[in-house]
Structure formats: C-alpha cells, structure tokens
From Swiss-Prot:
Disruption phenotype: No visible phenotype. A9 repeats lie at residues 489-584, 601-682, 698-777, 793-878, 895-977, 994-1073, 1090-1167, 1183-1272, 1287-1365, 1382-1473, 1489-1569. Microtubule-associated protein that may be involved in the maturation of cell plates and proper insertion of cross-walls after cytokinesis. This is 187-kDa microtubule-associated protein AIR9. Keywords: Cell cycle, Cell division, Cytoplasm, Cytoskeleton, Leucine-rich repeat, Microtubule, Mitosis, Repeat. It comes from Arabidopsis thaliana. Residues 67-255 are annotated as: Disordered. InterPro entries: AIR9-like_A9 (IPR056284), Leu-rich_rpt (IPR001611), Leu-rich_rpt_4 (IPR025875), LRR_dom_sf (IPR032675), PH_AIR9 (IPR056287). Interacts with KCBP. GO terms for cellular component: cortical microtubule; phragmoplast; plasma membrane; plasmodesma; preprophase band. SUPFAM superfamilies: Outer arm dynein light chain 1. Residues 110-121 have a biased composition (Basic and acidic residues). LRR repeats lie at residues 267-290, 291-315, 316-335, 337-359, 360-382, 384-402, 403-425. Strongly expressed in dividing cells, like the meristemic region of the root tip.
Length: 1708
C-alpha cells in the first residue's frame, strides 16, 4: 500500500511555487468567495482523458460540517473590496450533504524536507460534496498526527475512521486522482479561496480537529482540504479544469469557476481558526477569541488594518491576512510569532515592509497586489519563497539578506524595466535562487551575473543603478567613491579599491589608492589601518577575522566559497576617518601546488658568518611537507655550482665562498609530494674576513739538534706572505733576541740548551694586509742524548749469509751499544708493529740470515749507549733489498718398500733452496731398466706413496721429483728406480656369491672377485642341495652362469670357485652360500608369429610357444592400429578376417600367457605391416528410371581397397543395346553420343526418348583399375511436366516493355501470354494484350504492369500460369533541367535568384506543366582561397534566392537545384556558379548615439557598417543648437567615443559618420544626434541654488604666467577670490598682513565677455572681460569648474542677448 501511495504522491505532489502563471488570472480565480457559489462536483478536463491510478484508502475518517450555508436572496449586500477585487454576488440555494466516507491517500515518508513553497504540482481528479443545512453538527474526531510547515516527514500520515454517532449526521466525500494538473500562482497563494486553500499542514505528534465558526448562523461552514505533502486545493485550481493555459478576462473566468466544499482536516479547535470574510476590523474585538495554541489562522477577506493583538499567537505557523486594509508600517507585533512559517499579506495597501521583524522560521511570504515601492525589510534567514507581484517596486535598493531564497516573483512591477533584472536578482540573492518570475533561471542571465564585480550586490542594495557588465566595474567604483568622498581626509581622493582574487592558503592583497587632490601638501602623513572580515554572501553580516589586520590575508580552508571584505581606515594625526572597503570574489579551493611568495636571506656576507634563508610559502590547500633547500655558489663570471652537503636553511660561509655570490634555492613540497616551482635568491659577493691566526703552536722536541716548526690556523681569505720570527730569551737579561726570521722551522743548537725558544706568527692575506701577531714559547731546550747516524747493513743478502750493521754514534763516547734483528715484509719502515723478531737484543753486530728471512727485508735495531749506561734513541736500519734465496734442488732421493703386487712403495727426498713450494711427484712403469722415461702412472701423480697394482707386475717402478720453490721457481728434476721387477701375488678369491632371481627359467650368475696376477682358467661347479642339506653337483654346469630348469624347483643352489692364475698356479677353492629354494617361473610367451596372407579379404591366425608351468586359458586380442597411433580392438577369436577397414592399417596381436593356477604372465604382442588392398572390381551397377532434369544417381558396389576416382561415361543411344554391343559401347559409331563423364547425370531435353548407358571402370585409390562394368536403362528418358520460370518484364523503351520467361518440360508448344495492370494491390487483366511485347498507355501511369506466361508442351500438355514481378510504377519522364541561371548581381547585399531553363521537347513541356512537384535548392560557398573545385554547404540556405553577405566577398557561390515530380522522383543535379563576390557600396545603417544625456557622461556612436571590410571611416562630432540647422564642429573629436563637457549644455550632439571601405571607396555620410545635453542633476541643483542667491564667491588659483599658452604649472599659481553677482564679475587678490585686498579684474557680462574652457585640462577655465582683461583660473576639480562656468553663464544670459554659440570657445 505504501508503494502505491508513494506513486500517487509522486505524481500529485509538486510545489506551489511552480504554479505561478499569471497574476491577473490567479487573483481573479483565487479571490472568489467560496460561500457565494453552490458546491458541485468537478472533474478535470485533463483528468478525464487520462487513465486513473488506483487510490488507496487508509484509516478513513468522516468529517462533518461545522455550520450550514445560509444565503438569503433578500439580504442586503455591502459593496466592499474582497479577494476578487470586485463586489460579492448574491446567490440563493440550498445544498445537502450525503453521508459518505472520505478516501485519501496516506503519504509515505519523504526524507527530503518540504515546505509549502517547495511543493510543485498537484492534481485533483474529482471532488464531490454537498453542504449540510443543519448548523449544529460539530463534533470532535480522533487526532491526526501532522507536522505543520515541516519540510521533512518522519512518519507516514494515516487517518482513523470515526463512526457516526447518529444516523442523521452527514459526511463529505472526496476522491483524489493522481492525474497532474497545472500549478497555480504563488503570489496569490495567500489569497486562495477558503474552501480550496490547503492551509492545514501535517504535524507529528499533534492533534488537529475541526473548528466551528462563532458566527455559525450567518457565515458559511469552514473547513479545509487535506495536504499530504503536496495535495493542492481543487478550488485553487478552478481555472485548471477548463484549460489552465488559456488567458481571459476575470468575467470569463468567473463563468467557469466551480466551487468545491472544503474537506476538514482533523484539527482541534485549539489549533485552528478560520474567519475568512467576517468583516472583522480588529483583532482585539470581544467576539474574536485568539488563543496561544492556535497554529493555523485564516483572516483573509476582512477589514483589518492593524496587527494589535496578534502577538498572542506565539505558536502560529500559517497566518493568512490577505485582502484586508493593512497599509503598513505596523508589523512589529509579528515579532512574537517566532514559529510562523507562512505569511500571506497579498491584496492589501501595504507601502513598506521596513517594520516587518525578523521571523526565524518564515519560509513563505506573499505580498503580491500591494503598493510596495521596494522590498526593504529585515533579514529572513529561512525564507524560501518571496512573491511580490503586482506592486509598484521601482528599485532594488535596500534589498534584504535572504540566505536561502529559492523563488522570487516580481511580475507587473516598474522594476521590470531594468535590463537584465534576473541577473541583478541572482547577484542579490545568491546561488540559492532557482526560479525567477515562475521560470527556471536562464543560462544567459546566470552567465551575465558572473561577469559583474563582487561589490555589485552591495552597491545594488545601496541604490546603485544597474548597468551593463562591461561598465559595472568602473560604475560601481564611482558609486562607492561618490559615497566615500565626503568622509575622506580633506584633499584626498580614491584612485583604486579592490582585492586580488582569493585562493585557499595563498596571499590575497588589497589595493587602496588614496592621493591628494590639492597641490599644497601637508606635513601630516596618512596611514592606513586594515581589518579583514568573512561572510557567506556579500549581503550578509561580515564577521571580522581575528588578527587579520594587514594588507595581505591568507585565506584558510574554512574560508573556501566565502566572501572576503577588507575595510581600510585612513588615519591622519591620530584621527581615524570612516573606513572604505573592498569585496572579493568567493575564495577558491587551492590547487594543492605550493608556490613561494617571497625569499629572504639574513646574515652578514663575510667569511665565517652564518647566513639563513627564509621562505614565505603559499601552500594553496596542500599540507606542508619537507621542502627542498640547497645552496649554490656563483663566481663573478660563472654559473651557479651546487655546494655539496649545503641542504639546510643555514649555511656558514667558507673560504671557497669569498668573491662569490651565494644562491639560495627553495622548492616547496607538500606531504602528498606536490612540488611547487623552485625559487632563487641571489646575494651580493661574499667578502673575506680580516686576517687572523689561532691555535699557534710549536711542533718538535725541544732537544739540542732537533728541528722545531711553528704552525697556526690561518683565517681571513686567502693567506698571503705571512711573517715568522724565532726569538731566544737571554738567561741574564731576560730579553728576547731574534735568532731566525722568514721561516717557520728552526734547528736547535748548543746555545739554545737551557733556554726557551719563542715563535711569532704575523698573519697576512693575499693583498698584503697584516693581522695581529700571535706568539708561543717552547719548553726548556734539553741537551741531546747519544744518537746513531749513517746506520746501514753490510753483507750479502742471501739465505744463510752473514750481515753486519754499522753506524756513527754521536752524543758522547759509544759504550756497549746493542743490536736486535728483525724481518719486515715492507720496503719502508712503518714502526715496530710491522716487524717480526729474528733474534734478541745483543751486543754483537753480526747476524747470519736464517731461512725464515728469505723474501723479507732485514731490519737492524741499533740502540746507542754511552759508557755510563745512558741510552739514546734506537735507530732502525732497513736492508736495501729483500733476502734472496738459493735455487731449488734435491740433495738426496730414495724408494723403500716390497716390489710385489699389493705392496706399498714410499719415496723420500731432501730439499734445499728457500721455502719449498708445491714440488711435483711422478711414478713410472718401465718394461726394462733402460726403458726411459717409462709410462706415467696417473693415479699416483702427486703422491709420495704408491700401492702396486696388477698392471705393474713384471715391470720396474721409478719415482721422479721436480723441486719447486714457493715463488714458482722450478729446479732440476731427479729420478730413482726400484732394484727389481714387480712380482705377482698368490691367486685367491676375494668374494664369491650367486646373482639372479631364484625362479624357474632364470639365468643365475656366479659373481666373484679374483686377486693374484692375471687370472687363468678358473674352475666353476654348480650344486643342487635338497631340504636336508645334501648337496649334489649338477652335471654339465661348469661355467660362471646356470639356467634354472623345472628340476630345480624346490631345491637350493650354490657354486664353487677355484682361482687359477694364467701361469696355472692355483689358489684355494671357495664355495658360495646356498640360494633358494627355487620357485616355479612366471608364465611367459617365448615366441609369437602370424600365419596367413596380410591382404584384404584373407584370414589371419598365429602360433605361440608357452613356458612357465602348466598352460591355462591364455588371453588374446586382435587390435587394429591406425596410422595416427589410435588402437581399435577387433576380436578375441583364434583368427581374423581382414576387411576394407584394415587396408593400410596394421594389425596387432596381444597374447597374454596364463598358468593353470590362473597366474597371468606378461602380455606379448606382434604387429603386422600395413594390410595390402585387394584388386579393384565392380560388384554391382544399376540405373533407375530417368526423367528430364531429374538427377540420376546410379547404385554401385565396389570392392578392392579404398575406391579412388573411377572413370564414368554416360552415353545416349536411340536403340537399346545388348551383349557385346553394350560391353563394347566405347567403340560404337555416331549413333551413340557421349553425354557426361561424371557419376551423376541430369538428363536434358536432348535425352528425352533415348536410352542412357553408363560405362564404369572401377579404380582403386592408388590408381589401379579393374575390369569395366556397363549398364543401360530399361526405358527411354521421360519428358518433365511443362513449366516456366524466371518470368520477367524487360523495358525496351520508356513506353514499351517485353515479357520473357524460361520454358522447361519437353519441347515447347504454343504457349499462352497475357499482361496485367496492378493498382493499389488490385491486379486486372489488360484486354487484347496477348503477345510478348506491350506498349504503355496513359492508363498505366502510376500503376505497375505484370507479364503472364502459361507453358504448353508440344504434346498439348498445359502447365501452370506464372506471372512476373510487378514492374516499377509506370511514370512519365523525369523532369529535366537544361541549365541553371542566376538573376541578380554577385555583389554584397544583392539577391541572387536561381532560375531553371526547361527543355523544349513536347514530353518535357508536358512533364513540367502537369507532373512537376517541389524544387529543392542548396547554396554553397567556396573557401577563402577562392578554389572553385571545393565548396562548403550553407545548411540554412535552401531557397531559390540568396542574399549575398559580407562573408561571401571574394568567394564564389554555387546553387544546386534538384526538381522533384509529383511521383517523388528527382531530376539530375543542376547547378550554377558565380564569379567571386564583390563588396557592396559602403554605407552605415542604424546609426545612433548612446549616452545618458548629461554633460558629464560619455557618449558612444553605434552603427552597422555595410560594404565589404571597413577601412578608416571618418567620424566627426558636432554641436547643434536646438531649432537651428547650423552645426558647430568640435575640433579633434573624431573617435567613436566622446566625453561631454560643460560647453555642450543646451546643444544637441551630432555625429557624422562617413563609411570608407578598406580599398578607399567612400560611401555617403550619415548623421545621428542626441537630445539637448542637460546639466548633471547634482551640478544643476547646486548651480540653481547659487543663481538664486544672486551673489557667489569662489576660492580659485590664478595663473600669473605671462605666457598663457604654456601648460599651467603648479609653481606659478596664486590664490584669488572670484566674486560674481547678477550684474558684474571680479577677481580679487586677498589681503595680507602687509597689504589690503585688491581687485585685479572687473567687468560686466556684456559683450565681448565670455568664458572659455580647455578640453585638455578639466580644472582650468579662462574669463575674458575684454581684449585687455582676461584671467586664467585653476580650480580643484572638474565639478567645481563646471559649477563656476554654469553660474557665470547663468548670470550673463540675463544681460546679454548674444547667442551661446559665440560663448562656446574651445582651446585647440
């Protein structure tokens, strides 16, 4: 049920906002009083023609009427305005109500919040009700939970059925259809008739009951229909039932008005009040009882003029005050109605909504049909629909802030004269606006609104006049400047005020330009204070942003989509002036790509200092990540080079940076990896630091004879010639004396012993600048200990040689110095750690080199000692080269061991010559002692021992050693040979055992291992042992193998072996272990052979031999093996008959032996070669009865392998052949005819009546042929039944046709022909047309003809009539066009007309006159290149005429023409081409001047040029006095724009436009003029005031330059007072402390007095009294200049009749 209800609801529920159509019709229909019309049933015209959908009823209720409808025919009628705008009508009648139930559809839950303004459409199929005449039928019903005004229903609404308490209680019935009806107006939704308005809204958890009117006796019954989401009142749609879209007068609509009784929503008396049309004048009257519980109050069509008393309705949600006498203001009492959602104020006399308070829940407001001049009111935060049609609204000024407004209606207001009003409304309301004046927003208007600057909405609300978008930026700025100019500091003007386009997390800067207008500057400095604010819309309240008080603001993420406002407050001398502001466009979402706004480098660019880079990054919506920084160094004339490791924001300048410019590179990176553009920042060149030195020290031992070195850490650019000094302190005087200079090294002498040595370091840079000297002192210099010099090693550096260390000892007399020897693998001494001891420390200085020192360097540690035991520093002496070794050699070589097979020989030798490496060992065989070098024994190579093998028996054995040193040096080889030959060993058996399966039929082998020389004829014997262990030799078994037989079953087998050497020496006999018992063998087929011929048709059998116990039932299978390996089992018989399927295949026999106990042996198989085929032969050949054109398939049987392509010959013979004549038919004469050489044959007409013979030679697939087989038919070939096919009509000429067909069925006789005519599916025989040809007559036009063919055989057998397919419709000739010609000239603007030239033939003249239909045209244009080969179609140009346009100039035009006749056919394409189009004569069309008509406005000339491409056309602006034909040229004004000035006042501006084509051709000049130029209103007002006073003074600056033609400068201006009255004018020099005021220029307004202005300087004017008295004046602004000029001319006009033309002089 809910699904059906939802469907009904979906089709019926729509908003009342879309229902707004036309206010006149709506007001008239809605305003009719429901009490004045009898209730009748209504059926919608649209609903009547639409299939009704089922209506589901749930919890039915039975409402009752609260009062009866009483209308007296004699009751006096008070004439007053009601909701229809007219007077009430007198209707007499009585209505009855039949007791019926109310059926309504329960609304399904709608998750989308819907309020009344959002409902779009609804439909009522039929409503019927009757009114009860009894007044006292009020009764409360069960509560219905509804949610008034709510936009989201959380529960579906149901209605409970209430049974009537008495049988006399009537009821009303309403049926609701799902048919859609056109929607009604929103503007007058507050003025709907009381019985049709859906005032009740569904409430959750509330009780709604029927309300009885307090004046039941005189007023009609009050009820309302049910609104379930979107049911609209049938009365609201009265015009819908008669065609909603039609418009008519109110009277005509009234005649169709049908009033329905209202259906009561079960609203309780305490929640609902309906007093419509009760002439109530005050809400505080005694008879009106307003309750705080009321939620639905309907007070329309009364006489209320004040809202006093309405404040008690603090819970009201729907308030209808339409069609009363409210004039406003006085809406303050509504402030207490916080729950109000819908307010209807239509049809009153309201002039202003300024007093309407802010209603936090108001969603719908109707103020249509009032006298509002503007929509100024308090902000309504939830208002969605504002209906303000039929008012007097003229301006958008003070438009309220409506943040969620969706629908705005302002039809029939003067405001509609504003161009692009819809775009202005979009700007004021914002993106929530969906509909304007009952239409969806126009895309064009939305696009136009986007072109306006951000401050447009604010300016509109402040009263700015809406203008074109391209002028809006300048116009709104001027508007704001005009508002601000009086609040700015004195002398300051605003030059600019705008904000950059804001983007997320990117700097947004404001631009305010204030400059001084006055030339005299003040000493006070102007400062600007800033404050940024943010708001959702430009008209909403801006909220200041905390700490956003700078010129630049960085929008945050929460600012996206919002509007920024920057307020700039001028401050001068601690005085704050009113702020000015600028509005931004909505904040855009950042692109996520960061960018660097600025880079700064801090730090002094001096060597050793730290500089730091700081970046200001706009992250543009990205999350800051780890950015990439790097430092680069750039030389003066080089490119930047990256500094390795310098990747931090801080960098310490080093020596390498001196003279270079540092480059800081910064690349912003977000966390997501998005990189911005890298930015660079260059520094100045780095300077070197002043020279200095630190960490000065002395290295070396302070001992006599040692060398001291002074060192220090230099800093300060590149080091230059620094100075060094060595000083020694005098022991007696303590003074320092210079002992060395210019070097950093000093060798201590005997004089230095016991003193301190001082080292002085004076740093100097490369430029010679010296720094502060730094000094340091050494420790006390000590005397030198004993020391060895010139130490060296003497002797031969070879293995086992003696060497000696020598040296000179200083530092006293040498005592028992000690020497210790080492070896070292390095040729350079690197300390004690790399030395390896060879001896202990001894006094002896000689040493014999051991073997371990070979390859090493010899090191001697020489420790000098004095006789008193003082030791000096040891000295290490390294030999010049490494110790060499002797060449490798052997000092002895021998072989020990027994020379017998199996014996082991061992070789030993003595090696000398350094460390032995991998010496080489080899053993050799020698047949004799002189057999050298012998045969190498490979397996013994590299071994010192050799085990003699059998191969060495009888041979000598030798051993050879090749000494090899560890360095790879090879010595001389040396050999040693055994003294005797190798003897063989005694024969013996190493191992013996029986090998093989102990099964009958298996071959056993004796596996043995012999040793003892070469084996001879050893002896084997086999033994059989029974179960009691008694062995028995097996006779004849004397070999190494034995085949088990049946006799061995159950016994054990063993073998004996007696080894015999080849020299017949015998060894002991060995017996193997017994093996057994022997078991019976597995059944086996030892042989298998085929018997028989392997040819197709032969029988194949086999012969098999069996072993393995007693034979049982053996298995066998015959298998066919195909060439592809696939096997097919054929049979299991003892034989196989070969067939055709076996030919070429192999036959395999599988034989499985089976023992009698059922044990199966291994299958054995044999296979044949391919089975050969038999000789080919034909076994059978038959020919069935033959008939013409019926294929004959003979029946044949072949044998002899696979049949190949045999030879078939069909013969035709008139007589039947027999015997040899038949078998030898191939030799027959001409009476026999060969017909075919295929197996199958189809008899033809020639074969009818003859016999057919088939000659067949059977052929095998390999080409071998058999004997031929011949057969003849039993009877002659019979003819076929007569028939005809392919019956068709062939067109001979345009008016002649021929019938054709293909006859079949024996020989044709006199066949019959006929012709038919087909028209609209009816086929009629054409009389007299019985031949094969037919000539078309006029009766055949637009018809089709058919040809009929009845076949007749020669024997008079008649066949079936066959008809051809209908021809195409017989039509006359297609219209032809001889040629296509043009009328008109190929000139821009001219009209070309295509005309056809008709052929003069009679038939074509007839066709064109009688059968011509439409003619289609298509125009084409060639490309710009002028290529006539290709054209582009002009899709819209499809008429015979074409007006040549501008874009056609220089191109060729082509027109294609196709003529269609009345039969739908088309002629061949005809076309005509033009020459290249020439441009038209230049002219200007629709010339006009645009401008607002004041002397301060900008005027522009507009017109449409015609005549090719416009060249340098001439424009001249002129003035014209009203009523005078004279024109005064304005010099220099030849542009399309003209800025008017004060000299134009009272004149018409005239522009003369002379069009000139680009090739110089000049057209006729055209002029346009304006209305007389008026004074700008503000200036006019000011001038009138001054003229009325009669005495005016101005403070001006006077130009005292003696050369007035020069440009006025600021330095030659002096202050003067300009005084004027109605009679005279004078220029007065003000007085000072030293002088009185003096009059410099005085004069009256008589001729030649005049005032001149200067177009190049709008602040300057010249007053000319006469030829000798004139003065140049400079004022502060153009405005003041214009006021002065107009005031002077105003005074002058009274006394001077001179035409103003002589007064308007312009400086050129």
């Amino acid at each position: 049920m809910e699904e059906v209800a939802a469907k009904v609801e979906e089709e019926t529920v729509e908003t009342n906002v879309d229902a707004v159509k036309e206010d006149n019709a709506t007001i008239a229909n809605e305003s009719r009083s429901p009490e004045s019309v009898s209730a009748v049933s209504v059926v919608s015209n649209r609903a009547a023609s639409t299939k009704k959908k089922p209506v589901i009823s749930s919890n039915l209720i039975k409402p009752t009427a609260s009062s009866s409808l009483r209308v007296s025919g004699t009751t006096p009628v008070t004439i007053r305005r009601n909701s229809t705008g007219g007077v009430t009508e007198n209707l007499a009648g009585t209505s009855k109500v039949l007791p019926k139930q109310v059926s309504t559809t329960a609304s399904r839950t709608d998750p989308v919040r819907r309020s009344l303004p959002e409902l779009r459409k609804s439909s009522v199929s039929s409503l019927s009700a009757k009114t009860v005449s009894k007044p006292s039928l009020s009764e409360s019903k069960k509560s219905v939970p509804v949610s008034p005004g709510s936009r989201s229903l959380t529960k579906s609404t149901g209605f409970s059925l209430s049974k009537p308490e008495s049988s006399a209680r009537p009821a009303m019935s309403v049926s609701v259809s799902s048919k859609r009806a056109p929607s009604s107006s929103v503007d007058s939704s507050g003025s709907r008739t009381s019985s049709g308005r859906l005032h009740s809204t569904l409430t959750s958890g509330r009780t709604v009951s029927k309300v009885s009117s307090p004046s039941a006796g005189s007023s009609p019954s009050v009820s309302s229909s049910i609104r379930s989401k979107s049911f609209s009142s049938p009365l609201d749609r009265t015009s819908n039932f008669s065609g909603r879209k039609k418009t008519s007068t109110p009277e005509s609509r009234d005649s169709r008005l049908i009033i329905l009784p209202k259906v009561e929503v079960k609203a309780g008396d305490d929640m609902r009040l309906d007093l419509r049309g009760h002439r109530i004048r005050s809400l505080t009257s005694g008879g009106l009882h307003l309750s705080p519980n009321l939620e639905f109050v309907y007070l329309r069509d009364n006489l209320l003029s004040t809202l006093e008393g309405i404040e008690i309705l603090n819970r009201v949600k729907v308030l209808d005050l339409s069609f009363n006498d409210f004039k406003g203001p006085g809406f303050e009492p509504l402030e207490n109605c916080k729950m109000l959602q819908q307010l209807y104020l239509a049809g009153n006399q309201i002039t202003s909504l300024a007093s309407l308070p802010q209603l936090p829940n108001l969603e719908f407001l109707s103020v249509a049909q009032n006298k509002l001049k503007s929509l100024a009111m308090a902000s309504q935060p939830r208002l969605q629909v504002l209906a303000a049609s039929k008012n007097k609204i003229t301006t958008l000024k003070d438009f309220p802030y409506l943040p969620v407004l969706e629908h705005l209606r302002v039809e029939e207001n003067p405001l509609l004269k504003i161009s692009h009003l819809e775009a202005a409304s979009i700007l004021l309301v914002g993106p929530t606006l969906k509909k304007f004046n009952d239409r969806d927003l126009s895309r064009e208007e939305v696009a136009i609104a986007k072109r306006y600057p951000p401050q447009t909405a604010l300016c509109l609300r402040e009263g700015w006049e809406f203008c074109k978008s391209d002028l809006a930026a300048e116009s709104t700025f001027r508007f704001l400047v005009e508002r601000w100019k009086d609040t700015l500091p004195s002398g300051y003007l605003i030059k600019e005020a705008h904000v950059d386009r804001p983007s997320e997390e990117a700097p947004c800067q404001c631009h305010f330009g204030l400059f001084q207008e006055s030339p005299t500057a003040t000493d006070q400095e102007l400062a600007l204070k800033f404050q940024w604010s943010v708001a959702d819309r430009s008209l909403s309240n801006f909220v200041p942003i905390l700490n956003a008080t700078k010129e630049v603001y960085w929008p945050k993420r929460e600012d996206i989509g919002k509007i920024l406002k920057i307020e700039c407050t001028p401050v001068m001398a601690e005085t704050e002036y009113p702020s000015i502001f600028a509005i931004s466009s909505p904040v855009q979402r950042g692109k996520g790509i960061p960018k660097v706004v600025s880079l700064e480098l801090n730090g002094e660019l001096v060597e050793g200092n730290i500089i730091k880079g700081q970046a200001v990054v706009a992250w543009c919506g990205g999350t800051p990540g780890k950015c990439i920084t790097s430092w680069l160094r750039r030389k003066w004339n080089g490119s930047p080079v990256v500094i390795d490791g310098a990747e931090d924001e801080e960098y310490m300048l080093s020596l390498d940076d001196v003279g270079s410019s540092m480059v800081f590179m910064y690349t912003p990176v977000t966390e997501g990896g998005a990189r911005g553009e890298p930015q660079y920042k260059y520094t100045e060149f780095v300077k070197a630091a002043p020279p200095s030195v630190s960490n000065v020290r002395i290295t070396g031992d302070a001992v006599e004879g040692c060398v001291l070195k002074g060192v220090g850490d230099y800093f300060g650019g590149k080091e230059g010639p620094s100075k060094f000094e060595w000083l020694r302190k005098n022991k007696e005087t303590g003074e320092l004396s210079l002992i060395s200079a210019g070097t950093s090294e000093y060798t201590l002498t005997q004089e230095d012993v016991g003193t301190h040595v001082t080292f002085v370091y004076i740093p100097a840079n490369f430029e010679g600048l010296e720094g502060e000297p730094v000094s340091t002192s050494s420790s006390v210099v000590k005397p030198a200990p004993p020391k060895v010099t010139d130490a060296k090693i003497v002797g031969d550096l070879r293995e086992n040689s003696k060497v000696t260390v020598t040296g000179t000892v200083t530092g006293g007399t040498e005592g028992s110095s000690r020497v210790q020897w080492f070896k070292s693998s390095c040729s350079i001494l690197e300390g004690d750690n790399s030395l390896e001891e060879l001896s202990t420390s001894k006094v002896a200085k000689s040493f014999r080199i051991p073997l371990g020192a070979v390859g090493y360097y010899i090191v001697a540690k020489y420790t000098p000692m004095t006789p008193d035991g003082e030791c000096g520093e040891p000295v290490y002496v390294l030999s010049e080269r490494a110790v060499e070794t002797l060449p490798p050699s052997l000092n002895f070589l021998s072989i020990t061991g027994d020379n017998i097979e199996g014996g082991i020989l061992t070789a030993s030798y003595g090696y000398i010559g350094g460390h032995e490496g991998k010496s080489k060992y080899e053993w050799h065989y020698h047949k004799a002692e002189n057999d050298l070098p012998g045969a190498l024994i490979p397996e013994a190579s590299g071994l010192l021992q050799y085990t003699i093998t059998k191969e060495a028996i009888g041979k000598f054995i030798s051993f050879q050693c090749i000494p090899v040193r560890d360095d790879g040096i090879v010595g001389e080889p040396r050999s040693c040979m055994s003294q005797e030959r190798v003897r063989p060993g005694n024969p013996s058996t190493v191992s013996l055992h029986v090998v093989g399966a102990l099964v009958e039929g298996t071959m056993l082998s004796a596996e043995k291992e012999y040793w003892g020389g070469e084996e001879g004829a050893s002896v084997f014997r086999w033994f059989r042992t029974n179960s009691d262990g008694t062995p028995c030799e097996i006779k004849g078994a004397t070999t190494s193998s034995y085949l088990l037989s049946v006799g061995d079953i159950g016994y054990f087998i063993s073998v004996s072996y007696e080894p015999v050497r080849n020299d017949r020496a015998r060894g002991p006999t060995a017996i193997s272990e017994i093996a057994g018992p022997i078991v019976a063998g597995h059944p086996n087929c030892q042989s298998l052979e085929f018997l028989g011929s392997m040819i197709e048709g032969q029988r194949l059998s086999f012969v098999a031999s069996y072993t393995g116990g007693m034979k049982g039932n053996c298995y066998l299978e015959w298998v066919r093996v195909k060439n592809n390996g696939v096997k097919e089992i054929l049979s299991s018989d003892e034989f196989l008959d070969l067939s055709l399927d076996d030919v070429g295949e192999s036959i395999e026999l599988i034989y499985t032996p089976v023992r009698e106990d059922g044990i199966e042996g291994s299958p054995r198989s044999i296979r044949t070669d391919g089975i050969a085929p038999a000789n080919p032969m034909g076994l059978e050949l038959l020919i069935p009865d033959c008939c013409e054109k019926q294929e004959v398939v003979p029946h044949k049987t072949y044998f002899g392998g696979h049949e190949g392509v045999g030879e078939y010959i069909w013969y035709r013979t008139k007589v039947k052949l027999h015997g040899s004549a038949l078998t030898e038919i191939s030799y027959a004469g001409e009476e026999v005819v060969v017909c075919c050489r295929t197996l199958k044959y189809t008899p033809s007409l020639e074969d009818v009546g003859a016999y057919l013979v088939l000659y067949w030679i059977p052929t095998r697939v390999d080409g071998r042929s058999g004997k031929p087989v011949v057969v003849i038919t039993n009877s002659p070939v019979a003819p076929a039944d007569p028939e005809v096919s392919n019956v068709r009509v062939k067109k001979l000429f345009s008016d002649a046709y021929s019938g054709e067909g293909e006859y079949f069925g024996g020989h044709e006789g006199p066949s019959l022909f006929s012709w038919y005519r087909e028209n609209d599916g009816t086929i009629d025989l054409i009389d007299g047309a019985n031949s094969k040809t037919y000539e078309v007559t006029e009766s055949d036009y637009n018809c089709r003809i058919l040809f009929g063919y009845t076949p007749v055989r020669s024997d008079s057998v008649v066949g079936e009539l066959k008809m051809s397919e209908p021809t195409e419709i017989i039509l006359p000739e297609v219209p032809k066009v001889d040629m296509l010609a043009f009328t008109g000239k190929a000139v821009q603007g001219d009209v070309l007309t295509a005309v056809q030239v008709i052929p003069k033939t009679e038939i074509q003249q007839l066709v064109w006159s009688k059968y011509k239909g439409d003619i289609q045209y298509q125009w084409f244009r060639s490309p710009e290149s002028g290529d006539k080969i290709s054209y582009e179609a002009l899709s819209s140009e499809i008429s015979c005429s074409y007006k040549v346009r501008f874009e056609d100039i220089g191109r060729c035009l082509k027109c294609e023409c196709v003529v269609h006749d009345v039969f739908g056919r088309s002629s061949e394409l005809a076309y005509a081409e033009t020459d290249p189009i020439s441009p038209g004569f230049p002219r200007i069309e629709k010339l006009e001047i645009e401008g607002q008509g004041f002397h301060t406005n900008l005027y522009a000339v507009r017109g449409n040029y015609f005549g090719g491409k416009e060249g340098k056309s001439k424009i001249q602006w002129l003035r014209s006095m009203v009523g005078s034909p004279d024109l005064i040229s304005i010099p220099g004004e030849t542009g399309r724009m003209y800025e008017a000035n004060v000299d134009d006042v009272g004149y018409r501006l005239v522009v003369v436009y002379t069009p000139i084509r680009e090739d110089g051709v000049q057209g006729h000049p055209v002029s346009a003029s304006t209305e007389p130029v008026a004074v700008e209103p503000d200036i006019l007002k000011e001038v009138r005031q001054k003229l009325e006073t009669g005495l005016v003074k101005f403070e001006v600056l006077c130009d005292k330059d003696p050369y007035p033609k020069k440009i006025v400068g600021e330095g030659n201006l002096e202050r003067r007072m300009l005084e004027m009255n109605r009679k005279r004018i004078k220029v007065v020099k003000p007085g000072s402390k030293t002088s009185f005021a003096t009059t410099e220029v005085r004069g009256s307004y008589g001729p030649p007095f005049h005032v001149e202005t200067f177009r190049n300087d709008q602040r300057r004017l010249r007053i000319v009294v006469d030829s000798e008295n004139e003065v140049d004046i400079v004022v502060q602004s153009r405005h003041l200049r214009d006021v002065i000029v107009l005031v002077i001319r105003g005074f002058a006009q009274r006394f001077n009749s001179t035409s103003l033309n002589s007064l308007l002089k312009i400086d050129t």
